[in-house]
Amino acid sequence: MKRLKLLSFVVLALLATSSASNANTDLLTADDLVGVSFWVISMGLLAATAFFFFERRSVSSNWRITLTVSGIITGIAFINYLYLRNVYVSQGEATTLYRYIDWIITMPLQMIQFYLILAAVRKVPKSLFWKLLIGTVVMVLAAYLGASENIPTIIGLTISIGAWVYILYEIFSGEAGIAAAKSGNKPMVSAYVSMRTIVIAGWAIYPLGYVFAYITNSADDNLLNIVYNMADFINKIAFGLIIWTAAMQNTTTRNR
């Protein structure tokens, strides 16, 4: 019963947000691939958010916070994508700058997940939490400042990539990488490696998009929106599902 109440609350809250967001917008045409991609990811994010919150009580207590954060990530992205969709339908475009509203919150939360899954199976220093958080905030903030021309675009890109390289070092060879290798928890290590792959491969799309949009000015806005939409769909939802899989495997092993 508690699960059903929680699921109902999450779905109703998100649908209420959706209704308010769509109150005064034009209709989406069926042949508009960009607009359709906004709807596809919005519905996927809504479903993922409900799923992660619903599944919290299916896993052991030390893993619940990871699913809570996964639900928060997809929930924030869902709300922002409704806004992006409305901007696109009403104005015919949705610039990348609007996406930073989402990224400045969700990407640091995704990096914090590395700390949380490690903390679920072993003791890790709190300093790791702050390293991952600050590194990711700098990465996104520098890119935003460059994209909005508050600082030179090339400087914004350089700082952002530098911060990205720093957090990659942390999760591959730094404190986080060492802690994962020593954990001895196979489901967690498997999830950690998969999440790490998303951060290096999936996140590479964002600086590439920055280069085409703000450095060379050669990006097709519609294509860029579709690529970003699909990247966010995979990066955010897959990230959470990977964590859920590890949480379920650890819970099953613990209950044997």
Language-model segments: what does each one mean?
Residues M1-A23:
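N-terminal secretory/membrane targeting signals
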Residues S19-R99, I112-R256:
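Polytopic alpha-helical membrane-helix bundles and their juxtamembrane interface segments
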